Amino acid sequence: MNEEDTDFAWLHNNSAEHLRFLSHRIFIGPIPSNFIHSTSGFFNKRFQNYTKRQICYNVASPNEPPIDFSFLMHKSTDENPDTPSNLDSPSTQNVGSTNNTRASQSLLRRSSSFFRRRHRKNGTHASTDNNPFSESSTLQPQTAERTSQQAVRSAITETTNPSVSVQNSNSTSTSSAAMIIPHRDSQNSLEIAPLISPESQLSSLHPSSSRRHLISTPHVNRGTQFKRSSSCRNSRQPLLSGVDKHLTSNFTDANLIIKQSVVLARIESTFTVLPSDYNDSAAQRVPRKTISPWSQCLLVARQTDVENSIRLDFISKKLRKRLNGDVVHNLDVPHDKSYKSNYLFSVVLSPHQASWNIYNSFDNSMVLWCPYGKNKTLICLLNFQSSLLSFEWISIISRALLFSPRPSLLISVPAFHIHLRLNFPCFKDTTRPHTNETFVTTDDITQLSRTSTLSLSTASPRLVHDLVMKSWDISEDQFVESCLGVLEVNPEWSGIVKTWSKSHTLGLCWRMYDRLEWINSFSSLKYVGLLAAKDLYQLELRPKLHYPNHVTFRDGSKMDEPTPVEGYLIRLTSSTGRKTRYGRMFHKELYFAIFNNFLFAIQPDSVLPLSMLSKSLNLDDKLPFLSNNENDKYVYEFDPFKIANCRASGLNETIDSSVRESFLLLLQAERKRELDMLTIADSFLDLSRVESVCPVEDVEERNIFEITMTNGMKLVFQSYCERTRNLWINKITEVASYWKQRLFLDLQEYHDVRETNINILHIEQSIEPDVACYLNHWEVAGCVASTLIYHYCSMLGCRVIRMQGTLFKKKDALFEKCFAILIPGQLVFFQDATRTKFGKLCTKTHYRKRYSISLKNAFIYTGLSTMDEFARGPNDPQPHISRLPRCYEDGWQSFDRDDMLSFVIWSSGGVDYDLRPHHSVPDTAYGMAKDKLSKPKRFMFLARTRQERDVWAKRISKEINRGHS
């Protein structure tokens, strides 16, 4: 798996300053003993479970490599060589100690002054010297045996099916890597790789089938049998889709699986002859009948003897019931009852009958169509979980249908307003002998050009396809160096290019109007020549910019992003701003942590404090990852880059290997701890809506401060002492000032890009949405796109919060406004607006968590295919009718139609409403227990604008790609 596709790809960038900024955090105050001993019996069990397992797995990405704690074991044995260490039974004898007692709740809540005096007298906040958790911790590395047992019990661990080799009389299975396109050396030999059988993947679709089978084995255990309809058993041998003759070949020879994947399919039919460039925009002018909406099925590509073509088998149990009277064919499928009972239909990729195109360039969905029935055309829309998987299937289908990529392509450099033409040296273009074209000079391509120098007029389309794919087997750095080498030849650009390449990291991206999509992996780079031949995007060379971590105010002053803080506080007001409840003073002990402009509230017994994490790792003094501030004993600063060798450079070869390994292990553990806090957070406070933060002076205690919101609501908090109160006030004030300006600049960037493109095209604002969706890329080649909106942090996953903003979720026939936060592996929703039974909007202080949607094994699609999700009545406005613009509270106006704002998430995990009990163990509490037979759900959303919809869809798709990788 490519390291750039994992959740820790941000560790491999070259900017040491950016790495230090991402990993720097501050913990304020000691750990209050009564926060833990309020439920000492449960916390004992919970903390053992948490510290022994929580750092060893990722909640969102189970495919990430586990953390090696060998250096911790080595450290513990070196310090105490004579003392045996029992890692499986951590020391928790002080957890249930009765020395630190807590006053009765009835005594604490008699009155405001009495509550605070008793609170201080009984030691509500214990110092670190008297706190057993400050001196020792239960965080211990686990053994390999315990890790394997917990991996089986964990509900988050992803299980993979064992690979099953495909047997054939003319070919033998090999143990080589999986091949996308088979290479035929002779007529009787075909190299394939052992793949997972379709039955093993069908077990995930149909949980009732508990056994797996070999496809070509004649005598196997059949397992659960699916009943077939009598119409299919008694029907005669039908015509194969896409071929005008009966199927007479022997499927024993045609059982060679080239590729198989679980896809999302939509099946339609029409009587109209489709154009060769049929796509999402052309579908509006074609009358179609939907045979089956978007549903999950297994797509299998097999080699056949019919015209030496490839056959696509669609397999699904649920779709068979819908398509039984339409397109189900009783073909001589492989001899397996489970395969036959779920078999739908086949499409033979014949160049004379079948056609293909990229249906939606935004979500990389593709469309296949072929003759079907009498004067009918069968349309199959395919949506994939990842862009790389989509490119692989496009490569297979395009090669089978004799689609040959172009031997050259144009690359735009927006910084210099020039275009470069790159030509593949494995071809000799006889039609254009005198051209000033630029050649990519790499060792691989040069060797390929010496062995095969062909003419375009004599080469076959499939050979051209294979040679172009081989020509792109180069790294991104080699490709960028080739482009820069061309620019440096010109004396006019040589000095500028050298300065530009030193100050920025350059990369390749696709551009379509104002949208950018980075090519950030070697696997995606090999399909550039194939996608460029479709003329859907513009390939560009741009600098890779991260999300800005500084702002500039109107007076010219600059401010860096404040360091996020976390710690324990007591909230003395309810969500409605009241200080009393049922005649008693409101009192809630919580753990607060700042991420971006949010102050998240977490239950104290559900989180591992930052100070305990580093002390439990027991690192030596040479690596001061977390230490007390010299001027303030209540401040713990977590800074892994606090080493002199890491000030100038990042994690490169100049650093010692042991130090580099310790860095990576600690940063991964800290990222997983942050992700766990966001997963279990109950609510958050939006600090960008804070008006003022000031201490409360009219009380006897000096450790209380008040936050005033822009809507007039007030929140009261109590800290450990006066010093910690001042620290919280300063940090919250800095975060509020910074993120108010940062969010304003982000919105201004959206507005500037749209206004610039409107002025370039000389169009009205109401026409701009149609231009963005339906014009070709050469018609909008002069428009601009922003790398600050589509920054490189979204590709690497530098920040744990990938996206945030307002979405409108479809609930029955209405849309519910909610606030969404995208984190690795899931999309979390918080309640945005509450109303009374009379419809009056209620004011609130913070956002409560509602539910979350798992992005594991999910799909996302956009465009006109989402219009079927709308439940419209006869009086509802139709999407093609013009309407007044939508106006939002921040001043943004949107003329976009519903189909330009909508996107649908097809999730097999369903919704987690966070119904776990408060006192529960993390192994079994995270997520609602789901039935194995639960149906997948579709969730439809509307964004505020088309620009925000594009960003939401791209980043959600990237998270789905990481989970699929």
Swiss-Prot record:
Family from the record: Belongs to the SPO71 family.
Membrane-spanning segments: none
Provenance organism: Schizosaccharomyces pombe (strain 972 / ATCC 24843)
Membrane topology: Peripheral membrane protein
GO annotation, cellular component aspect: cytosol; nucleus; prospore membrane
Compartment(s) of residence: Cytoplasm; Nucleus; Prospore membrane
Name the UniProt record assigns to this protein: Forespore membrane adapter protein MUG56
The PH domain, residue ranges: 562-737, 800-961
Polar residues bias (residue ranges): 82-101, 124-158
Entry superkingdom: Eukaryota
Swiss-Prot/TrEMBL keywords: Cytoplasm, Meiosis, Membrane, Nucleus, Repeat
Annotated segments matching region Disordered: 70-175
Alphabetical list of PROSITE patterns matching this protein: PH_DOMAIN
